[in-house]
Amino acid sequence: QRRIAKDSAYWYREVMRMNGENLSCNQPYKQILFMEPVFTHNIWGGTKLREEYGYSIEGDDIGECWGIAAHPNGTCTIADGAYKGKKLSDLWEEHRELFGNTQGKVFPLLIKIIDAKADLSIQVHPDDTYAAEHENGSLGKMECWYILDCEPDSKLVIGHNAKTHEELEDMVHNGRWSELIREV
């Protein structure tokens, strides 16, 4: 799709109108935060994070690279600049001004690169409301996937095919997994 200057000018005006005070060129420069990631060892993990992406990590079971994380189970360390050596979780607590108008007590992102050499388990992720009430006040787990590489004929499981709660229960209790699970 071709963009023309008129379209770009329109969208620039719209962005500035809606959030201009936070995007103005007159704001003081804020450095880009480069981070040292957190790695996890998982039974389904592999070696691609080291062999194909150049991370210097040991083990043949590296499942996840947490590239942006301020999570209780692992937080990135700032790699350089004014905050070098500081944990992202500490920066979030002590310097909220660096993160714009983000609301909430919990750092809202967990960005991962996953190397799954074996099938992953099917998981059910809560929304924010359920997680706040039942998961010690944490955020829900909304996901977005960007697949860097996969084997031919790979599939993703996204949701299920049950139309009602009763149908879901019936499919689970009777082991009708191939009918229940939605693969793409």
Predicted region positions:
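Active-site glycine-rich loop that binds ribose-phosphate moieties when present
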Residues: 164-184
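Residues that form generic nucleotide/phosphate-binding pockets
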Residues: 15, 91, 95, 171, ...
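Transition-metal
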Residues: 24-159, 163
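Catalytic-face loop-and-helix region of soluble metabolic enzyme cores
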Residues: 14-21
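C-terminal beta-signal and terminal closure region of outer-membrane beta-barrel proteins
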Residues: 4-5
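Conserved, mostly hydrophobic/aromatic
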Residues: 1, 12
